[in-house]
Amino acid sequence: MTDHLERDVSDVAHKWVPDARLGVCDVAVRPGALAGCTTSRDALAALRRIAAAAGLAADVRLLPDSSVGDEHSAAVTAAVAPLVREPRVSADHVSEALHGEILAVLERRDDAWLRVRAADGYHAWIHSGYVALGTAAWADDWAGRATLRSLGAELRCEGARFRLALGARAAPLPSGQVETADGRWWDIAAGAVRPEAELRVEARLVAAPEWALRWFSGAPYLWGGRTAWGVDCSGLVQATYAARGVALPRDSDLQSTTGQEVPLSATGGGYEAGDVLCFTDGHRISHVALWSGAGRIVHSALSRGGVTSDDLLADTPTAKRLRDFLVAVRRVERSRQ
């Protein structure tokens, strides 16, 4: 009986929440009940039908749930905040949230951990120490005012220092200072901030891989990273296109389904600068890179220690392996030609 119910619950999850990164269906068979939570109303209805047919209680919560109260939103107050797979410090680091970004709060656990949804749709956990909580109206107010984006800005206030990662958000003040998400006012001591619209124009003046190298060259590889302090392959691609006003999913396999398909070419014929090259590990898309032209790619690779430019057509074991595992090329931005 239990095995049958577990299969039914698994089938519901696969149907209504096929990707656990983009939704939640965390339900288990307990003595006398189905228990857990989900973000899908359709999954909730199906689980209730399964429980009723089996004579079980349906203790399944729809997220966001009552643990959130009125605080449905979180603004990141740390310079960068890790998003993790489970609500514990040692859990896998799956992504990051930058200062000033707004997260949707889905569940609160033990007053320490929050299950959240990021703007790119990613679902994960974050420790409450990294954020400030508030209502949806509070978050909308901050988002409307936080029109500045960091270009490696270093802020100072009465001896305190605060570094903002590339792309982090701040609000302009009439005094020329900036306000951060925790309400503090700062002077800009180094680096710069730009209005988002201005940054978008500046980013589009150069090809995407050139912009990526300008701001990320030499950044160390970090699984789940999104900043020049540490970035993975899909984080680099996502950040590069975010600066251009193009929203991409977080992970490489998700990025491989966006945009327009470009026919594969052994020499790169037909590729344009900024096309996203997608590589497999033999099972799934596991790496992405930006085509730079003349056979070169820009990517963040563990084998290279971080962000660099490589010759994809070179006669080296690494380049040959990449060519052998190239399975798709996607154009995520309208061609300039």
What are these regions (language model features)?
Residues 213, 225-244, 248-249:
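Active-site nucleophilic cysteine motif
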Residues 86-92, 152-160, 257-267:
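Short alpha-helix capping/helix-loop boundary micro-motifs
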Residues 22-47, 113:
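Short glycine/threonine-rich beta-strand-turn micro-motifs
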Residues 101, 168, 274-275:
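Structural motif
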Residues 25, 45-70, 88, 110, ...:
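Boundary regions of SH3-family modules and the immediately adjacent low-complexity/disordered segments
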Residues 247-306, 312:
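...with weaker cross-activation on analogous glycine-rich loops/strands in unrelated enzymes
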Residues 133, 195-199, 264-267, 292-337:
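Aromatic- and glycine-rich peptidoglycan recognition patches
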Residues 91, 97, 164, 270-271:
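Short, well-ordered loop/turn sites that connect or cap secondary structure elements
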